[in-house]
Amino acid sequence: MGPIILSSGGYPVITSTAYERREGTLFAEGVSTVAIADAVGTPAYVYSAGTVRTRYRRLAKAFHGVPHRIHFAMKANANLSILRLLRGLGAGVDIVSGGELFRAREAGFQGSDVVFSGVGKTRREIEDALDAEVALINVESEAELRCIDEVAAARGAIAPVAFRLNPEVTVSTPHAYIRTGEKGNKFGLSREEIGRLLRVLTYLPNVSLRGIGMHLGSQIQDAEALRTALPVLVDAITAARAAGQPIDHMDVGGGLAVPYESGEPEADVEDYAQLVKEAALALGVQVLLEPGRFLVAEAGVLLTRVVYRKESAGTAFVITDAGMSDLIRPSLYDAHHEIEAVQAVERQVVADVVGPICESGDFFAKRREVADVAQGELLAIRTTGAYGYTMASNYNARPRPVEVLVDGDQFAVIAEREQYEDLVRLERTALTWRSA
């Protein structure tokens, strides 16, 4: 597990080495988070560039000795500055929409840096992917494979594809919604379906099968699921080669766990890598990785200010200016995020930490011992660099928060806070009516 420090109240809080206290104040690398909040307001997402670099290099080092490429799953954090940071480290990207393809290109990625995943790619998205000459399109159904062949034929092109295998392996994750490799899941192809598609490929001259991959889910804390699933993937690659397909890579997806609370284990990256490397070397294939959360989650905190304190029917409430529209993970997944006072507070209180949204499900913590902060004080919600801003919304007509990147003793705004005018910018008064 990563380093742990004691909060001002004496309870353990997960941290990357980028977030430490100096004279009682939480710093992001060399910058006071109080100074950041004073400069840009709250709510504010803050990311540590140093943490992203450290995580990427750890993963790359673990896979040293085998041909590999790390494709960042940009659904975790799609800010252009984060993408450019990772591109500079040598990463490619794993995308799941045409919008993400656009963002990847805006961040400077070439088509050859892009792997396109997802179960519901539209015809236009496939057209755009082929026009961009992406490295691979991960196929998840026969209908999709046939659509790719049609689009490629219309362009006189050969589309590079990979099959996404569903190994039908039960995975232990914190929430059912983040399991993707189990039987009956919408993702991927069963072994039987892959066998059938290997025969279908004979009649589809405009697709070229380059690899087979899988993605078991998210927040996988041990290697047992991978140990069970890898032989299924190896068998699928062996069968494809026997059918005459020149498979040159295997994709093991992402899903490496990060700790969200004290005592929660982090994935054993080195053990995970060793299992994959052994299989890859035996097959003579390149390894593709699609980490998202692992690279950016611990890099981020969400700064929020206490608007009011309240007590009702024996329950203490800490009401903040951030809500589920800014960070939906606790409401959607019942996810745990450590919450600490930005400036040292000795007192503790058992309270619900909630937002201003008009929903009972708008909370960050329930009946939890937290710092007994007063109105106007700052809180830091930890491990929010992944699936925070990318899942934010304008619910209750709330502008999305500002994003800030810290690097050493400097910080920069990398996404301006939305303004009220932005909420209606795309809307039009119904003056021109059309007949069906």
Give the residues covered by each predicted segment:
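A charged N-terminal "starter" segment
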Residues: 1-160, 199, 204-208, 235, ...
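Short beta-strand segments
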Residues: 73, 160-166, 213-215, 251-253, ...
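Short acidic, glycine/serine/threonine-rich loops at helix termini
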Residues: 82-83, 106, 126-131, 148-151, ...
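Hydrophobic residues within beta-strands of alpha/beta enzymes
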Residues: 93-94, 114, 137, 212, ...
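Charged (often Lys/Glu-rich) extended helix/loop segments that serve as interaction or gating elements
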Residues: 275, 284-436
